[in-house]
Amino acid sequence: MLYYLLKYINDVFDPPGFGVIEFLTFRASAAAITALLISLMAGPWFIRYLKGRFIEPVKEEAPPEHKKKKELPTMGGILIIFSIEVSVFLWAKFDDPHVWLVMLAIFWMGLIGFIDDYRKVVLKIKGGLSARYKLLGQISLGLVIGLYTWFDPAFAVLLSKTTIPFIKQLSIDYGIFYIPIVIFIITAVSNSVNLTDGLDGLASGTTAIVVSALGAFSYLAGNAVYADYLKIPFIPGGGEIAVVCMAIVMACVGFLWFNSNPAEIIMGDTGSLALGSAVAVIALLIKQELLLPVLAGVFVLEALSVSMQVLYFKLTKKLSGQGRRIFLMAPLHHHFQLKGWAEQKIVIRFWIISILFFLTSLMTLKLR
């Protein structure tokens, strides 16, 4: 909205300084500041409103340290989503389909997460929304994203093609498998972020790091000169995603102000599913989805720990009659909790690992 207003003023009256609205870096920075301020200013009121209304009880199977915590208001993801949506609405270009697809993903999976949280904390239905309905929501989003990008001429340049990290000379054409792969990536990443949201600040901080890198890739991919120099796919209009990325990053940072240990609020599935789907869709749109195992390495490790734990337990139970575990508890962050690591230490160390993955991902820009 502000973009079009300021652009109109600049075109009609040509006041000094208003031309800066055309610069992507300015609008990305403005979106970041707006998202941060909304989070910080609305946060205290929002927390007061949620207290006594939407409290998530501590799970019975939670580690002992978790059981010592007071029950916290959940659905904090609403604050994150609101901050993102408003800042993007103010500073991004509405006519860019990349922006709307990411916004659709955030709203869609945020709604699925909200229903799940509402069933758990208000209706007191154990487990919230059943896994099959969550999966249905993820598959539906994947279908919409996949079909839209398949048929919209704006995405016809690359469509089902993508690049291989570290080997830029090679590319892959998914062909008829494009839509199933889109569905798989959206489902896998959104679930991975959801599994990571188990300690104060872990999911929000890690997401901010991951999306920062995606923002850099988006900016470079949307510039024909930079894309050609770095040998990455040129995505016409893809630079506009950087505005969305910066809004996501600072909405997470603003939320982290209240979510850091000891947390005053948690994001719930409302936030984790929305953020996970955003990460997946952004990576797909800028053709960096194959980089996610590196860039989103912490999310991948968390998801793998759960898969390995379940499979190993079932296999050993079938072979010996008694199930065994690889980890003390899954996801991985709970394993370290039970080993005696302080929660703050786990979170900070996982952030450090995320930064290492972030830097490794940026290194791929110069590798031929």
Curated annotation (Swiss-Prot):
Keywords on record: Cell cycle, Cell division, Cell inner membrane, Cell membrane, Cell shape, Cell wall biogenesis/degradation, Magnesium, Membrane, Metal-binding, Peptidoglycan synthesis, Transferase, Transmembrane, Transmembrane helix
Subcellular locations according to the entry: Cell inner membrane
Pfam family, one: Glycos_transf_4
Catalytic activity from the UniProt record: UDP-N-acetyl-alpha-D-muramoyl-L-alanyl-gamma-D-glutamyl-meso-2,6-diaminopimeloyl-D-alanyl-D-alanine + di-trans,octa-cis-undecaprenyl phosphate = di-trans,octa-cis-undecaprenyl diphospho-N-acetyl-alpha-D-muramoyl-L-alanyl-D-glutamyl-meso-2,6-diaminopimeloyl-D-alanyl-D-alanine + UMP
Predominant place of localization: membrane
Keyword Magnesium found: yes
Functional note: Catalyzes the initial step of the lipid cycle reactions in the biosynthesis of the cell wall peptidoglycan: transfers peptidoglycan precursor phospho-MurNAc-pentapeptide from UDP-MurNAc-pentapeptide onto the lipid carrier undecaprenyl phosphate, yielding undecaprenyl-pyrophosphoryl-MurNAc-pentapeptide, known as lipid I.
Family statement: Belongs to the glycosyltransferase 4 family. MraY subfamily.
Protein name: Phospho-N-acetylmuramoyl-pentapeptide-transferase
Gene that produces this protein: mraY
